[in-house]
């Protein structure tokens, strides 16, 4: 049988996340086929990909049924994988398809082990009602052994950062190599310097944008633009209390984002133990330093004092105020060249070169 070279199996394309961007780049750059669980109009345009796209159609609006459909879809609807030499799995559910590819090469690109199963298990449970907690625990008991069994069948595990490499070792007892996610550094450019600091992290509790808002309510002479959306939007607007120096730009398109990044003084990004974090790299590609946090993937991308400032791992609004006052427009300009040089280490070309070598390796 003549086998096709390779295919990527990814959870879904229902929105434009970092994992989806990575898979899109991989399929486009290496001419790989793609299989996925679901898609929506909010995700990437898969019609531009050169290879075959296979929709497993495991989407459902009902939480419990959605979990069953995902399990069934990736376990039972991926028999076509036997036609490929190499399968790359990306996401939480996609690895369940490994049973349908017993021969050939199986590569798992791990963005993170499911955080609701491991390091953020108690955090997730604490945010749920009693019935939801019971359902969540029952699902975890069902899913965790299936997930771990699938991971142990992989030939190669790739971590997106040293941070994730440690999680894989701690929680799954497996070794992993590191290949950082791709940043399209050619898409972000220094355009100038206006009078604002920029946050474009998703408005999710783990991104801790609330701490930024609290800080800027105490700095009326400093301007903050928040260019994103998410479940915390209304809470953050209430927290901002109508302060004129804080602007909520909402969801912006790619061109608007490039313009906002390219004209900022600096960008702000303080997530809780971020897996890797591509937005600081995009900021540095535009010559803009990052006010970040000294934990997670940011320790691998930001050079303290040269491409930004890192505050302590559990920052307070006062920490942000001090950092913003230190990261003046003049100091930010002095960091431009080193920022651009550092971002080049995470380019799309380097990512594709390393992934291509891994696929071809025997």
Descriptions of predicted regions:
Residues 33-97:
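Active-site donor-binding segments of glycosyltransferases and PAPS-dependent sulfotransferases
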Residues 289-292, 302:
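Short hydrophobic beta-strand element within catalytic cores of glycosyltransferases
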Residues 189-207, 213-221, 225:
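Conserved donor-binding/catalytic core segment of Leloir-type glycosyltransferases
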Residues 234-258:
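Nucleotide-activated donor-binding/catalytic signature segment of Leloir-type glycosyltransferases, i.e.
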Residues 125-157, 165:
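Membrane-proximal helix-turn-helix segments that form the acceptor-binding/catalytic region
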Residues 272:
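Aromatic "clamp/platform" in nucleotide-sugar-dependent glycosyltransferases that forms part
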Residues 69-71, 315-319, 333-360:
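A charged, aromatic-enriched C-terminal amphipathic alpha-helix characteristic of glycosyltransferases
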């Amino acid at each position: 049988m003549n086998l096709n070279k390779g295919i990527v199996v990814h959870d879904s394309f229902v929105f434009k996340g970092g994992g989806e961007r990575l898979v899109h780049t991989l399929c486009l750059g290496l001419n790989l086929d793609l299989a996925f669980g679901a898609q929506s109009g909010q995700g990437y345009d898969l019609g531009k990909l050169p290879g075959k796209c296979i929709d497993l159609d495991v989407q459902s609006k009902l939480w419990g049924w959605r979990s069953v459909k995902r399990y069934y879809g990736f376990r039972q609807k991926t028999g076509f994988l036997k036609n490929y030499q190499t399968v790359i799995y990306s996401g939480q559910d996609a690895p369940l398809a490994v049973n349908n590819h017993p021969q050939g090469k199986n590569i798992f690109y791990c963005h993170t082990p499911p955080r609701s199963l491991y390091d953020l298990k108690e955090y997730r449970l604490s945010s749920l009602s009693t019935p939801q907690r019971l359902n969540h625990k029952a699902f975890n008991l069902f899913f965790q052994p299936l997930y771990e069994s699938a991971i142990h069948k992989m030939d190669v595990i790739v971590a997106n950062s040293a941070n994730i490499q440690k999680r894989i070792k701690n929680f799954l007892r497996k070794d992993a190599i590191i290949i950082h996610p791709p940043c399209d550094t050619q898409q972000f450019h220094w355009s100038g310097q206006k009078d604002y600091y920029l946050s474009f992290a998703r408005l999710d509790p783990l991104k801790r944008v609330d701490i930024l808002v609290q800080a800027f309510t105490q700095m009326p002479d400093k301007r903050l633009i928040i260019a994103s959306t998410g479940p915390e939007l209304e809470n953050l607007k209430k927290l901002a209390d109508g302060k004129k120096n804080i602007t909520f730009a909402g969801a912006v398109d790619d061109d608007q984002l490039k313009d906002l990044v390219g004209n900022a003084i600096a960008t702000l990004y303080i997530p809780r133990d971020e897996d890797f974090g591509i937005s600081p790299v995009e900021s540095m590609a535009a010559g803009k330093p990052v006010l970040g946090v000294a934990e997670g993937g940011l320790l691998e991308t930001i050079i303290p004092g040269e491409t930004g400032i890192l505050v302590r791992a559990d920052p307070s609004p006062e920490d942000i105020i001090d950092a913003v006052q230190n990261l003046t427009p003049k100091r930010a300009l002095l960091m431009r060249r080193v920022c651009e040089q550092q971002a080049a280490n995470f380019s799309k070309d380097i990512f594709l070169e390393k992934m291509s070598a891994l696929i071809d390796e025997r």
